């Protein structure tokens, strides 16, 4: 299982690098308007990173719940990914906040989006910290998998349904 996670991580890293290159090559990464600059940063960098961290935590947590055992390496891997997730989530929140400050017309929708996004992500973080890392393996692996999948899908859905259209409007 560990080898497939490592291979998947490499593949996603290359895909994210290609996404960043697209933003750079198209001039989007350096948009001069603060509101679109920060929203683009969220779409190109922060949100995909959160999605990737959640994906890794989904795999790690599901594995632990399936085996009903938490080894030292798994504990370490989950802890590292939780730390990385918190950094990525902070970057998302900062991008949304800065975009809202730069464009008060976006404030209410971005605050709502931030609240929804944090609520879903925090469900995953809380379960990992309060249950799995403390040796509570009662949750069914499929239920955990589904919970994390909801958070991942929401991050991409909100990006495609709300952030990208907002960026497109700002760039016109």
Task: Report the location of each language-model feature.
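Hydrophobic alpha-helical segments
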Residues: 1-172
């Amino acid at each position: 299982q560990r080898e497939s996670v490592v291979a998947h991580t490499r593949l996603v890293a290359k895909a994210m690098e290609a996404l960043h290159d697209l933003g750079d090559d198209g001039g989007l990464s350096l948009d001069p308007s603060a509101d679109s600059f920060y929203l683009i940063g969220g779409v190109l960098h922060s949100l995909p990173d959160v999605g990737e961290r959640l994906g890794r935590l989904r795999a790690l947590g599901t594995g632990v719940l399936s085996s009903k055992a938490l080894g030292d390496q798994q504990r370490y891997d989950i802890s590292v990914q939780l730390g990385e997730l918190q950094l990525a989530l902070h970057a998302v929140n900062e991008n949304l906040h800065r975009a809202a400050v730069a464009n008060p017309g976006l404030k209410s929708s971005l605050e709502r989006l931030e609240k929804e996004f944090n609520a879903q992500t925090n469900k995953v973080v809380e379960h990992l910290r309060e249950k799995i890392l403390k040796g509570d393996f009662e949750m069914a692996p499929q239920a955990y998998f589904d919970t994390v999948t909801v958070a991942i899908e929401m991050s991409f859905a909100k990006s495609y349904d709300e952030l990208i259209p907002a960026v497109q409007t700002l760039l016109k």
